[in-house]
């Protein structure tokens, strides 16, 4: 089979692996050339354990979280799951992700959104780089050659603004607070954050890339938190902590983050990736 046979399968509706097995059993192909037709466009990307910002150097380590996107239909060909470990003995490809759409542009933009909402935490991957490529105008225009990366030089990582960093840090702080409360052996039936008296603010510091963020938060009698970051004071309410997901409102705006931790590292994945 060709390496990218899923693309052919998506546009023809033919199961090439099945056909290969039938041939190996001495049976003929189940279709003729005249039976085949091309329907729309399919596109595939490969998620690798590699660091695009460091000359695509392979990366290894535990997969703390792997969750497929739910925003659109997509095919995942992968052998990893949450808890897998990516070693150095083999090629660091983690998954192939394939989408189908009526046009090439629709397929590209759909795949970018699927990638953006695919949650992979624990090791550096090329996911954000692939999203950049798929949304690059030159790529959408079909200006793709073997020197595309050197010639167009798409961003190697996703740009994250200060507000997104702060919100991700708040999600990590709220998740940590909830997990500590859950692990407590006293008054477990009382909801997280509730106090019969106002407690002093809690203080936590995070580093995201080259940026540092300081979060101070104080529980209120109604179970909400006053959160201070930079010159902002925000009201945060914890809606739910379900597995790795934390659902909260920030000044009345509801957002959900996936939050995992590994020793002193906190990994967050929010609405924008």
Residue locations for each model-derived region?
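Well-ordered beta-strand segments characteristic of repetitive beta-sheet solenoids
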Residues: 225-227, 248, 268
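Structured, non-catalytic alpha/beta "coupling" segments that mediate domain-domain communication
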Residues: 44, 54, 250-273
């Amino acid at each position: 089979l060709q390496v990218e046979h899923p693309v052919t399968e998506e546009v023809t509706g033919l199961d090439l692996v099945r056909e290969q097995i039938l041939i190996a059993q001495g049976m003929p192909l189940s279709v003729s050339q005249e039976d085949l037709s091309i329907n729309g466009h399919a596109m595939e990307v490969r998620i690798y354990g590699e660091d695009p910002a460091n000359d695509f150097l392979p990366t290894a380590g535990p997969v703390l979280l792997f969750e497929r996107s739910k925003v659109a239909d997509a095919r995942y060909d992968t052998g990893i799951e949450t808890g897998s470990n990516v070693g150095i003995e083999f090629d660091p490809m983690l998954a192939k992700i394939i989408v189908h759409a009526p046009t090439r542009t629709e397929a590209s933009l759909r795949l970018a959104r699927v990638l953006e909402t695919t949650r992979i935490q624990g090791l550096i991957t090329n996911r954000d780089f692939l999203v950049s490529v798929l949304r690059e105008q030159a790529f959408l225009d079909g200006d793709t050659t073997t020197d595309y990366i050197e010639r167009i030089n798409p961003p190697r990582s996703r740009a994250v603004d200060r507000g997104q960093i702060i919100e991700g840090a708040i999600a990590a702080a709220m998740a940590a607070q909830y997990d500590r409360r859950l692990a407590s052996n006293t008054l477990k039936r009382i909801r997280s954050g509730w106090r019969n008296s106002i407690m002093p603010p809690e203080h936590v510091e995070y580093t995201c890339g080259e940026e540092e963020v300081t979060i101070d938060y104080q529980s209120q009698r109604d179970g909400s938190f006053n959160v201070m970051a930079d010159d902002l004071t925000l009201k945060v309410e914890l809606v739910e902590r379900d597995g790795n997901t934390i659902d909260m409102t920030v000044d009345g705006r509801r957002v959900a983050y996936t939050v995992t931790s590994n020793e002193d590292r906190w990994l967050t994945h929010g609405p924008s990736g």
